[in-house]
Amino acid sequence: MLDLAQPRPTDLALDVATGTGNTALALAPFVRNVVGVDLTREMLDQARRVTAERGITNADWVLGDACRLPFGAESFDLYTVRAAPHHFHDFDAFLIEALRVLKPGRAAAFVDCAPPAAARDVMHQVEVRRDPSHVRSLTVDEWTARLKKAGFEVEVAKSRELDWDFEDWMGNMEVQPALAAELAALIEAADGEARAQLHPERRDGKLWHAYWHCLIRARKPA
């Protein structure tokens, strides 16, 4: 995220859907101040504890919704969001809000799951059963189109393919073994182009498959 966001020492940065503040705290040494915003009070409380433990003095935490940010227009020099947009029910409102709170000429960095089109249907079936809060993952091309529609100028839009440990992924959400087995079977049953993209395989009895993140930097016109 840091390479993508290109933070500057004078920046007032906003990290949206910050969770426990991992991205915001990674930005903190490189910016003047960072604000983390999240819908979940308990997550923000944990972020505050970590901030105090590390002696970080330039990070603040605000309760708020990515689609209705509690900030004025043109308030921030940098906007970041990681691993959250696939949960948003109103994707266009999220992008409009991102554009609104950015100062003219300043950039936003987006990282999220972004499977290619052929694999997406299979992965969507898996994602929504693993985590019911999942709404939809966009492809990189869809991200680019939606950002341009919202008024952004897209500077970087690329996909990073990862070698994904299915068992660990299920464990992160404490998925019950019977359901995990069903979801593994969905991936292993993929055919055609979806299978070629997912390339599932067993290694020492464990399922591995491809997973994708988009890495996007877009700028508000000056």
Q: Residue ranges of each PLM-predicted region?
A:
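A short glycine-rich, Lys/Arg-flanked "PGG" loop and its adjoining helix->strand segment in the class I
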Residues: D92-A107
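A short acidic, Gly/Pro-enriched loop at the edge of an enzyme's catalytic core
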Residues: C67-L78
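Conserved alpha-helix/loop element of class I SAM-dependent methyltransferases that forms part
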Residues: M1-D11, A26
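Short alpha-helix
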Residues: R136-A150
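A short SAM/SAH-binding and catalytic strip from SAM-dependent methyltransferases
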Residues: D77-D90
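Conserved class I S-adenosyl-L-methionine
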Residues: A107-H134
